[in-house]
A protein has these predicted regions:
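Intrinsic, short, N-terminal disordered tails of RNA polymerase sigma-factor systems
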Residues: 1-11, 23
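Arg/Lys-rich amphipathic alpha helix in sigma70-family domain 2
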Residues: 62-66, 76-93
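Residue-level signature of the cytosolic catalytic core of signaling kinases
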Residues: 2, 66-67
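Hydrophobic/aromatic residues within well-ordered alpha-helical segments
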Residues: 24-28, 32, 78
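Short, charged helix-capping/linker segments at alpha-helix termini
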Residues: 14-23, 33-52
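Structural recognition of an alpha-helix C-terminal capping motif at a helix-to-coil junction
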Residues: 34, 48-55, 59, 68-80
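Charged, alpha-helical scaffolding/interaction elements associated with membrane systems
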Residues: 12-15, 88
Length: 93
């Protein structure tokens, strides 16, 4: 997906278009899961976080600003969510 296509999907999502989320999900599910799994190394947690990621992305659609490459932006969000989860799990131990 190009930056322009991604930006279009984010704009559509900001206007309530769930099909746009499906397009991003189909394009980036494997990438996001890989980023999360490679950080947390627990399949079930990675699956949960991947689902949470796309829910969060839908909520971020209206505030998305293009410019720095959407793939990097997506992976930073996924990695930060994973690190937050690891910290929360460590506190529970």
């Amino acid at each position: 997906m190009t930056d322009e296509q991604f930006e279009s999907c984010m704009l559509r999502m900001a206007n309530g278009d769930r099909q746009a989320l499906r397009e991003i999900y189909d394009a980036y599910l494997n990438l996001i899961f890989a980023v999360i799994y490679n950080t947390i190394r627990q399949r079930e947690e990675a699956e949960d976080l991947t689902s949470e990621f796309f829910i969060k992305l839908y909520g971020l659609a209206a505030s998305y600003r293009s410019g720095n490459g959407h793939r990097k932006w997506l992976t930073v969000i996924a990695r930060n969510m994973t690190i937050d989860r690891i910290r929360r799990l460590d506190r529970e131990i």
